[in-house]
Structure formats: structure tokens, C-alpha cells
Amino acid sequence: MSGARRPGTSKRKRNWHIEHPSFREERSQQLRRGNFKTVEAADSLSKAWLKCGEGFQDTSEILSLASEKTGITEKHLELSPKPKTETTSKNASELPNIIWSSSESDFSDEDKTLPALQRDGRHGPRADRLGDRTISCPEDEDIEDELQVIDWEVNSDKEDPGGPSECEDDKGTLDISDCDSCASLTSDDRLCEPSEPISTEILEYSSDSEKEEDPEHSLFIDSESPHKYQADFKSDARWCLVSQTDSEANSAEPTLTPQKYTVKFPKTPEYSVTKKKLLRGGLAERLQELQNRKRSAISLWRHRCVSYQMTPLGRKSGVLTVKILELHEECSMQVAVCEQLAGPPITSPPGGLAPRPGAYLKVLFTRETADHLMGHPQDIIYIFPPWQKLLIPNGSCSIILNTYFCQKAIAKETVREDLYSPDISLSRRNITLAQTFRIKDITDNSSINQTTYDSLATPGTGWTHGHEKAEQHLIVAAPLRNSLLDIVESQRAGLWSGVRVQVVVQRVYSLLSRDGARSQQGHTVGHADASGAWSCLLVQDACGMFGEVFLNSTLWKSRQLEGKSCSMSGVKVLQKATRGRTPGLFSLIDSLWPPVISLTEPSCGQPSGETKTYLPPPIFCYIFSAHPTLGQIDAIEDHISKLYQPPVVRCLKEILQTNECSTRCSFYARVIYQKPQLKNLLAQKEIWLLVTDITLQTQDERDHSLPKTLPVYIAPSCVLGPEVVEELALLVSYNLLFRDAFKDNGQIVCIERTVILPQKPLLCVPSASCDLPSPVTLDELSALTPVNSICSVQGTVVDVDESTAFSWPVCDRCGNGRLEQKPEDGGTFSCGDCSQLVLSPLQERHLHVFLDCPTRPESTVKVKLLESSISLLLMSAASEDGSYEVESVLGKEMGPLLCFVQSITTQQSSCVVTLEEIELLSTEGATAAQPPP
């Protein structure tokens, strides 16, 4: 085709103010004058794509292309601009111009002069053809003069309209090649070629980075042009496109240096399947690299802010200092209305409006930046470059974008905590596009589009131009949601969610405060009770999701909420719990699964249908913390919810006969012995309770599969109420209700989230039908007797442990064993506790004997005897001088003795069973353990 352009058929759109974005680190190398018709275009497109996310800076016709070695595979593109025949419409010319300016241009260096075009008058006509506005984008002050002008040759620039051109409006081709060696070429090595009207087909290319040569990875670009080029991404071949500096040459031609012959393989779907590594497009990979580099840059900058105190270096630094006046949230972005305190001056808004004394800005923060800043009204924020300013014609104020690098300063003035509490959540505004663009055709006046979800129901203000005009938004109570996930989605880091969710309280219990939970809740969450425990609720929503809520109220008030449907608001997420992290919590959740009624699907305030499909047990849940003043958990209904599952109380016989492992169980039982004895209410340690009920005591004596008594281990993580601790301090038998105890491998353990309550006597049940036999029957010592259990022992004394046999005097009044003997008083003893002389002290003795038990003939049974048994054993074995001979006690029968199994040690040839003789708790004043109704 001829290079001549038909008048009136093809025109450029010059009124769209097309601005070419430039990328960082693509700086000019030299300043070229107007007599240069061509310029070197050998920069790497991959470099531009890799750097495109560091901030867009607007330019008009100035496009810097730096010749830097990229060290990656070559990318060859043939661009064919299509003819532009349409003219600029009237509506297009009437569109408002949005002026973009960067913090590194007129904001950061406002005193810099526009280079190149403004200093060289010969470029004026060209600037008029490409656009009517120029914006300078200097990167640094030290390279502000190293700018390069690229002249894009068009038909209107040619003196000879019939001659060839580099780029034609009708049909043209611009070949751009990415290479490593084009920067080292001289002007003599640069060749040009007249462009021909061709169409381009761009195939996918390999993104592999292997350095080995493989002809199978060659890329073939086919087009209608007689010039067909081949690029080998696995070889050292380099294609480069250069522009000839000679004025007689007006075209460009690709040059191959050095020449290498490869085999061409067209890309087909069958070919891609046979490859071990699929050839992928590089755009997605480069976008991922760009996002990773962006996140890395932000993380590194925040780390520097924490390590070093970064302060603005004055006006030249381009740091914008603002003061937050009002905050709200729109479309997951935090919008801050700020007052500019320092930094580059704000230009006058378009429309000829006079600037006001004190510039007001709207600063947009992303969710990650807002979580890092945790800004509040009256806070001072430093916004470091590169930030961008957006001026909207007829707009209220300027908008600051690209605020990734921000730092909060400590405000000098004292802010009242009652007005700007850090625990107050931001107002949430749902703004539709119809309201933004004032579309009258859409007549959706529903309250959902005009609702501000604010947990405090405080009025929000929409800023227009400073403080003069404030638009009041409609504030209504937050709708009642049905999913706990709404709290998670609406919560901001460090803030409290104002979403109201309807939940059912399944369990109420206490948990010991941990250091991790205390640090996450902070010092303002409240305080635990005297024992250092927190009141907790296990709640479940209508969708089946569980959550654990830390409260600040007393436990007895929280127990009134169990089983009721409640409204929960003013909470925040402490952590996400999984089965691996909190197995105790999920063992309790598994006991409540599956639900007794059909669940509903999550919905945002709209009707939701029930789902009856089978749902697996949940694999995660959330742990919440209620605000000390704003947190509210109120009962909606007085009656018990249908979703509530009360603990199923069963008898001990039924629990032991089930083969379920790692499950929760609830039962009534009477405590007949405890070890150790608690003498004060604060001494909580590992406790073993020996319990029984009527079902174990009345079973057939010939059935030895079930024990008569059962040991229950109370772990230190199990919180005991004050009423239970008082029961443990008494030396009487008592009845307890064990809720949600953990059964594992036939052993019952009270762990965290297990509730132990004193049992109240049931008046409706006759006591005679449930009374335990007196005395309580125990199992005999056998090979099946476990450790930490009680049993009955009977046998013959075969030996005495003389190393542990001794006696000492004690006070006959108080039993104090630390008596003082005074020689001046004739060797009498005195008690320090009673402050009196002990005339007839009692003798306490300590003795271990070895028994030969017929129930365990192959084992050595060692028993620590009580004082009563020692006195009975030594009654007839005393000599005239008061000493005892070992031979006098051997062969005597002992028993039956009630003993606690301390340990069972298995050696190579024998087994040693260590027992301790005990006394069961008194049954005076105790009622029988009631079976479940």
C-alpha cells in the first residue's frame, strides 16, 4: 500500500488526551533534538511489565525506554495498528477530564521545570499533534536532565506523502523485540526495512528459564508478511529491532546476531499434551511476580518503619502529612477525610474554584494498609511517595491514591477516649453505582442501599468540601444475621464487629486464661474471676457453625443463657481454631453433632431456605471475645431453642459398656475417696476422685467385667467452682454431676470445658430406691486392677521393710508431730501450736509390710499400713523393752484392707504392686447418687 493517506478517511483521536504510563527504572539516557526522526526502541517489554506496578506516572509523548539487560528469554511481538477512520464524537469531547498527577512529579518536585518539549521549541508542533497536555514524571532529582524523546513517525510528519513510513494509519507494522544484546550494537550494525501491510498472529511462548539448548522450544510467528521470523528461546540467538540514524532510511528491519539454525515446530494441542512441561503464557506469571514484588516491597517498608523511626525530610521529600477528620468504609476500602498539614501544595481544583485556607483531602486506604495503620480520628498520618492525586472536575476535594507506604504519628493533642475510642468500629456504607452516577432510571429506594451498619448507631457524616457541609446518613440498627461468618467478614483487625448474629448457647463453662489469649484480648477486655478463669459460651448459629465466646460477666449469670436463642454483637475474633490445635473443643462439638433440626444456608438478612443434606462435622470454628462495655449477648426468647442439645446424663454402667472412644459423657456419681486431700480452696492440682453409683454397686458379683468403683481424673485445666472446692475440702462423701467429661480408652478424665456441679437431692424420687449399700463394696486386688483405683486386699505378712519402720511422738490434743523436748523440765515435751506441755504424747508409727495375696500369687504386694492396722499387728509382738522383732509379725494374716493402688512396677522376673491403706469418706449427711431419669 502507498504511504499516502487519503484525506478525511483516517484521523487520529487527538482529543482523548491519551497519556502513556511510564514505569520506574526506565529512565532516559540522553536528550535528542527534533532533527532525529527515529530512536532506538530496544527496551525489554518484560522489564516494563515487571515494573508496571510500582506506580503509574502520566506522560504525554515522552516515553523512556532504557537499554538494560534483562537476562530472560526473548519475546517478539509484531504490532499492527488498525486504521482509525472514525472521528472524535461530540460526546467524547464533552467527557470530564480526569487529571492524574504523581507524588514524584508536581507534588514531590513542584519547582522542577518541564524538560525536553518545553525547552526545545522545535518539538512544539509534535506535542500539539499528540496531545494538548504534558505532565512531567521525573523519578529522581539527579537524573532529571537525562531524558530521552521518542519521535513516533506518522504520516503527517512526512514531507513526502508517497514515501514509506514507519507507522501508517491505514496498515502498518511495528516490530518490537526483547533482547540482551541490542544495547551493545552500534549504528553501523543497525538495519532498517520498509514495513509492509501485514496481519499479525501472536502465539504463546515458553516461560521456561532453562539454559540448555532445546530446538523443540522454538517459537514460530507466522504472518502474511513475506518476512517470517523464528525465535529460539533455548539458544543464544538474539533478535533486536533498531532504528537507523541515517536520514535516508525511514524503516526498521530485524537483525539476527548471531545466526543459529533451529528446527521449527508449530504449536498444536497434541504437541502441548506430549510435553512434560506445558508451555504457559507469561502474562499471568508476570502478574504474579508483580504482585509478589509489590507485597515484598510493602512488607520491607513496614519492617523499616518498625526498626527505624522514619520522619519526613521536609517539603522536598514529597511526604504528605495529613490529619484524619472522619473515617468510614466503602467497598472494603477505608475512606479517610483528612486535612493537609504539610507536604506539597494541593493545586486548585478545576472549574476555577478559589482554594480555601486549609486543603481537605479524601485518602483511600486498602484493607491491609488500614489494618497496619489502625488509624482513628485526630491521628496524624505520614504518606510517603509514590502516592497519587486524583482531581475530578466539579468534585468536592482531591483524592489521594496509592497510599501503601504510610506511617502513623503520635498526635500532640490529647484525644478524648469517650469520643474516639479505639474499640469503636467504623461505619459501613453501601453505595450503589446508581447513587454515585445519579442514574434516575433505577428507582431502588430500598433501605438496604441507604443503610449504614454501625454497631454503635452513631451518626456518620459525609464530607463535601471541608467542614462547611456535612451530609447525615441514615443510621438504623444492624439486621440480625444467621451466620457467625458475618462477624469474621466484617471485622477489622484490632476493632470490634457490630454485626448482630442470632446464636443458640449450647454450653456454659469456665476456662483458665492463657498468656496467648490474654495478649490477643488486650488489657481492655476485662478481668477474670478470683481463680483466674474466664466465663465462656459455646454458641452455634442456624447454619451449624460453632464459636467460643469469652465473656466478662460472672458465670452464674451466663448459665441462665444456656439453651436459649440469643443475639450476639460487639465481639471480635481472637483466633481460628482447628481440630489439630484444640482437640478438646472439637471433642465437645462432636458430642453436639449432628444437629437435631435442619440447618439453614447463610444469608445476609434475607430469607434462607432449609437444607436437609448430610453435613460432615465442622473442621474449624472461631474463638471470639466480647467487648467489656459494647459486647451484648441477650436472650431473644425465654423458652429453650429447638437447636439446643442438653447433655445426656447416663449411668456409669452404661458408659463403661459402650465401646465409644474419645467421646464426651455426663453422669451422676458419689465420691467415696479423693486423693490428695485439699486443705485450702486455692490449692488446685491433679486430683483423683473414686466414684460409684447404684448401677455399679448392685451388679452381679460373678460379673467381673465391670468394676465396683471408677477412678475419675481431674486435670489442672479443668476449672472447679467454689462450691465444688468446698465439697472437696470436707471429709464426707458427696454427690457430683459431671457434665461433658472425656472418656478415652475406658478412663474418664475431666479436662477443659468439663463442668462439675454439686448434685441437688431429687425430692420426687424415694431415697430408699437409690441408696448405696453400706458399706460400699470394693473389688478385690487382681491382675485387672488399674493404677489409681481402690481395692480390697487380704494376705499373709511375709516380710517387713525395716528401712521405713519408725515412730515419733505427737501432741495428744492437736496431733502436732513437731514437739520440743526441754531438759530443764525433766525431758517433757511441749507443743508449739498448743503452747502447753504434753504430758502423755501419742506415738505415730510408719510401717510397710509385704503380703502374699492369693489373688496375685506371682506379684509382690507392698502395703503402707495405717496406724490402726499397725497397732493391731504389733499388739502381740512387743518385747519387754518395748522393741519389736520382725520374726514376731511374720506369718500373720492381714485384711481385708481398703487400699489405694499407687503404682504397679513390672520387673524382669516379678511384679511389685505398691498399695496404701485408706479410709473411705464418711457417708454422714450424704445422699445417694441418683440415676438418670
Swiss-Prot record:
InterPro entries assigned to the protein according to its UniProt record, in alphabetical order: DNA_repair-scaffolding, DUF4502, DUF4503
Segments passing through the bilayer: none
Keywords: DNA damage, DNA recombination, DNA repair, Nucleus
Location in or out of the cell: Nucleus
Main location, first listed in the record: nucleus
Acidic residues bias locations: 138-148
Cellular component terms (Gene Ontology): nuclear chromosome; nucleoplasm
Region of interest (Necessary for interaction with RAD51), ranges: 175-469
Stretch list, region Disordered: 1-34, 67-174, 205-224
Composition-biased stretches (Basic and acidic residues): 16-29, 71-87, 119-132, 214-224
Any one GO biological process: cellular response to hydroxyurea
Pfam assignment, any one: DUF4502
Signal peptide: none
Assembly and interaction partners: Found in a complex, at least composed of BLM, RAD51 and SPIDR; the complex formation is mediated by SPIDR. Interacts (via C-terminal region) with BLM; the interaction is direct. Interacts with RAD51; the interaction is direct. Interacts (via the C-terminal region) with FIGNL1 (via N-terminal one-half region); the interaction is direct.
PANTHER family tied to this protein: DNA REPAIR-SCAFFOLDING PROTEIN, DNA REPAIR-SCAFFOLDING PROTEIN SPIDR
Function: Plays a role in DNA double-strand break (DBS) repair via homologous recombination (HR). Serves as a scaffolding protein that helps to promote the recruitment of DNA-processing enzymes like the helicase BLM and recombinase RAD51 to site of DNA damage, and hence contributes to maintain genomic integrity.
Protein name: DNA repair-scaffolding protein
Gene designation per UniProt: Spidr
